[in-house]
């Protein structure tokens, strides 16, 4: 997925040529999070759908309501689930496909299908797809560790996603209760009084959709659980790894989603890159990082570029549109999970560093563009530009402190002055 096509290379170079060291001062900068259409703060972007002493369910603000620039994500939502030890999320189904990742802890996930119930044993970094309309329930089998899960929800009924619970609790009503008496007694072949007593009576009703359960039930379900058919983002399946970071990719072709897990060491840099087709939803798990994204100015008639910056930490979300160059620098050890929408036939294009996972291949810029063309694109000679692009010996993750504490040299200051007022990408 890392091999680029020439038009994509040229697009990336147009963006790259608009950057000077530290991104040229001609670019309008967005350092304030409230002015950044791609940034979702953990403090005020999550809405709590349900909460009790056993856990909570939260949903991220809808992308299209957050910014008109995220309209393409109107059919997607992020859901966070947390439960205490020895608890059960009651059976439900939804009018959406789910792609879940276990952020911490372990889980038993039961999928109730026409051919029978399948119970999966999931551990940290395991992922699984829940098909739309499938009845499922979720258990935290541990006795001393919370379970945390992040889910990408993909609706099949616009515009909202609806969870349907079989049973009534103090928090919500069973959807069975919506049917008329004559439909219920005929369907169950039982008097309505018995149906009301067994299914709808307030006595014995659970307080909420997350409930405490006993160890006997956990042991019984665990005996029938299997770990096959699930995929993992753990260290045993790394695609990219060096001293500064690790990366794992999993593509769910049926969902057209690229699932990625990234770890960056403190001081490390995920070099400037972009995705040719995928819109990436980045969810920070742990640590702190600085994200810099370069894209068109918001005014449609403008040809200038903007730099969107954000300091992200646990629970924050950042959206990276397709073809927008981005760089991520770790302030502390940081890790995050990302969901790439439109993953099929997507390429991750590195703008600097070596292009291959082993670091032995030439980077795609110098390998894909003739030195004579490079000489026409940049002020330096084609050979010198090619050498510059080949200076970095690592792929994806590098030491991010090479220019730390360095002051701009006179020629750098002059270059910044010359860049001021220039236009950026073509917008049409």
Curated annotation (Swiss-Prot):
One of its GO terms (molecular function) is nutrient reservoir activity. Glycans are attached at residues 31, 246, 335, 393, 399. One of its GO terms (cellular component) is aleurone grain. Residues 1-24 form the signal peptide. Residues 419-428 have a biased composition (Basic residues). Homotrimer. Major seed storage protein. This is Phaseolin. It comes from Phaseolus lunatus (Lima bean).
């Amino acid at each position: 997925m890392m091999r680029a096509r020439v038009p994509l290379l040229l697009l990336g170079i147009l963006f790259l040529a608009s950057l000077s060291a530290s991104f040229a001062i001609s670019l309008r900068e967005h350092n304030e999070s409230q002015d950044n259409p791609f940034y979702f703060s953990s403090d005020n972007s999550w809405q709590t759908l349900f909460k009790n002493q056993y856990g909570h369910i939260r949903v991220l603000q809808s992308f299209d309501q957050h910014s008109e620039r995220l309209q393409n994500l109107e059919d997607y939502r992020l859901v966070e689930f947390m439960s205490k030890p020895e608890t059960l999320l009651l059976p439900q189904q939804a009018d959406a496909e789910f792609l879940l990742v276990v952020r911490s802890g372990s889980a038993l996930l039961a999928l109730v299908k026409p051919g029978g119930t399948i119970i999966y044993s999931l551990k940290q970094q395991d992922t699984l797809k829940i098909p739309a309309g499938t009845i499922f329930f979720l258990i935290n089998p541990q006795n001393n560790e919370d379970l945390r899960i992040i889910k990408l929800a993909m609706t099949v009924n616009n515009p909202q996603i609806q969870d349907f619970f079989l049973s009534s609790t103090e928090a919500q009503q069973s959807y069975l209760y919506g049917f008329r008496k004559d439909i219920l007694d005929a369907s169950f072949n039982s008097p309505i009084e018995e149906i009301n007593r067994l299914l709808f009576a307030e006595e014995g009703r659970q307080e909420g959709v997350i409930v405490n359960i006993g160890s006997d039930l956990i042991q019984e379900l665990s005996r029938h659980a299997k770990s096959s058919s699930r995929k993992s983002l753990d260290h045993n399946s790394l695609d990219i790894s060096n001293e500064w970071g690790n990366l794992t990719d999993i593509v769910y072709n049926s969902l057209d989603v690229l699932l990625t897990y990234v770890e960056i060491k403190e001081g490390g840099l995920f070099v400037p890159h972009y995705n040719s087709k995928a819109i990436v939803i980045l969810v920070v798990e742990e640590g702190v990082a600085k994200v810099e994204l370069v894209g068109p100015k918001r005014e449609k008639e403008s040809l200038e570029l903007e730099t969107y910056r954000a300091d992200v930490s646990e629970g924050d979300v950042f959206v990276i549109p397709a073809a927008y160059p981005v760089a991520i620098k770790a302030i502390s050890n940081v890790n995050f999970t990302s969901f790439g929408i439109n993953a099929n036939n997507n390429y991750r294009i590195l703008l600097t560093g070596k292009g291959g996972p082993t670091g032995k291949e030439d980077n795609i810029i110098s390998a894909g563009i003739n030195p004579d063309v490079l000489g026409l694109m940049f002020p330096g000679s084609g050979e010198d530009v090619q050498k510059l692009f080949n200076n970095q010996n690592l792929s994806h993750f590098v030491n991010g402190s090479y220019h730390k504490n360095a002051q701009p040299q006179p020629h750098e200051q002059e270059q910044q002055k010359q860049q001021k007022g220039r236009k950026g990408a073509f917008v049409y």
